[in-house]
């Protein structure tokens, strides 16, 4: 498990421009991530996803996020997420640790 505080910094630097995490947070360029863990791809209510995201059919968890966040366009070809990814495993683990707490129902 990663470091939550480091993960929060990574979120602010690399994710917060397009995503919110709090319950009832608005969608930006990307969807609000509240309730992310255990949800299938392309399922945040009220967000317009590509067919690629809707049809991927995986459930978000530590393992799927670890793979996705390394290279989003490789993991879901056709996603509109323009983020290049986080190459360092430790940074991805930190971000996931933060997301696990910040997006919890």
UniProtKB/Swiss-Prot annotation:
Keywords, ordered alphabetically: Acetylation, Apoptosis, Electron transport, Heme, Iron, Metal-binding, Mitochondrion, Phosphoprotein, Respiratory chain, Transport
PROSITE patterns named in the record: CYTC (PS51007)
Record-listed Phosphotyrosine modification sites: 49, 98
Chief location category: mitochondrion
Gene Ontology process terms (BP): apoptotic process
GO molecular function: electron transfer activity; heme binding; metal ion binding
Any one GO CC term of the record: mitochondrial intermembrane space
Sequence positions bearing N-acetylglycine: 2
Compartments in which it is found: Mitochondrion intermembrane space
Function of the molecule: Electron carrier protein. The oxidized form of the cytochrome c heme group can accept an electron from the heme group of the cytochrome c1 subunit of cytochrome reductase. Cytochrome c then transfers this electron to the cytochrome oxidase complex, the final protein carrier in the mitochondrial electron-transport chain. Plays a role in apoptosis. Suppression of the anti-apoptotic members or activation of the pro-apoptotic members of the Bcl-2 family leads to altered mitochondrial membrane permeability resulting in release of cytochrome c into the cytosol. Binding of cytochrome c to Apaf-1 triggers the activation of caspase-9, which then accelerates apoptosis by activating other caspases.
Protein family (similarity comment): Belongs to the cytochrome c family.
The protein's name: Cytochrome c
Species per Swiss-Prot/TrEMBL record: Mirounga leonina (Southern elephant seal)
Underlying gene: CYCS
